[in-house]
Amino acid sequence: MNKNFEEQEKRAKGGIRLAREEVFKLVFGVEATESTSDELKQNFDIYLQNDEEFIATLNENQLEFIKSSINGIVENYSNIKDIIKKNTKNWAYERIGTVERALLIVATYEFIFKNTPIEVIANEIVELAKEYG
């Protein structure tokens, strides 16, 4: 399938889904390189500057969702990771796959700090896991 067609199809399916996917990708980059939350913020700033063509395709709600999510994750990064660590029984955080860690970070942030309904989070995270996991 043509990559441009795939992107258009995602935008048509729902703006926040595409925005959530972008948040996931940024968090994944940080988790894959074992970077800090400050580096997540730096990567986000670089993303905004260097991917102007893609950013221009986002609507105001999508861009605001991405910005608020990244800022919220950066602000609460260590708390989010602590919550995940406390709730993973018999499994070390470091042993969780990078994709799965990034998905857990996004899901935990949305559930605890954005009060997104758990049904929405579960559906969206499962869809991202199918695509990237």
Annotate each PLM feature:
Residues 1-132:
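N-terminal interaction/assembly modules
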